[in-house]
């Protein structure tokens, strides 16, 4: 199973150079519009130095580093608190000329951000790791919160309160936390307005729109370029991206071009 997952991740990334979404938008453009990052935990290298060499060999632009496992731990299993690993990760990224596009708190896929009393400490740990690796975006999935929270006033109020607090923490350090929800684009826009923090934006995930039968490009347009900090280019319909009939990458690229969006696109779940 691991061999198949690894093989298909390699295949997708090798194809990345000729994939339209990854191209520089316009021959006269000096700055690369779309940069490609790979999530380290999805190539079985969560907080492992080897992720940099692999992404370099595949001509990627950066790595989305995870904070480490969470589970029932009080804090993330995070190596980036230790000076030795801080230096090692920085030097390795520099060696391979790779950016750390974002720092991910993927532990919140399984653990509820709403139920963690020490949520500020966990986010502060991430903000510190971002400073260490010079990353400007954090990834915070809300998947661990029990479904339906957005329709229960007391739960929604608490989620908004917590996101406002950590968003302001991020903004004070000049960085952004990108949240992933199961809401549609209009729902995300409403949530962002309620949070009202410059430190919270949307980390848009293709899979959520596609699995819920939403028009992916319309969702992107509704959100607009200023509300999307980064994108997870992923789907789980059973095929690799070049053969995915419900994900039209040419159309997605044209949509992002028209929106004027510039940023990093991270690959996560890539399956055969």
Protein language model regions, located:
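Acidic/histidine-rich catalytic cores of soluble enzymes
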Residues: 34, 52, 63, 160-253
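N-terminal export leaders
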Residues: 1-7
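Hydrophobic faces of well-ordered beta-strands that scaffold small-molecule active sites
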Residues: 34-39, 63-65, 100-105, 138-140, ...
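Conserved small/polar residues in nucleotide/adenosyl-binding loops
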Residues: 268-272
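Glycine-rich, proline-tolerant flexible connector loops at the mouths of alpha/beta enzymes
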Residues: 66-88, 145-147
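Acidic (Asp/Glu)-rich catalytic clusters
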Residues: 31, 52-57, 80-101, 125-134, ...
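Active-site acidic/histidine proton-transfer and metal-coordination neighborhood
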Residues: 92-99, 109-202, 210-211
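Catalytic domains of carbohydrate-active enzymes, especially glycoside hydrolases
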Residues: 51-68
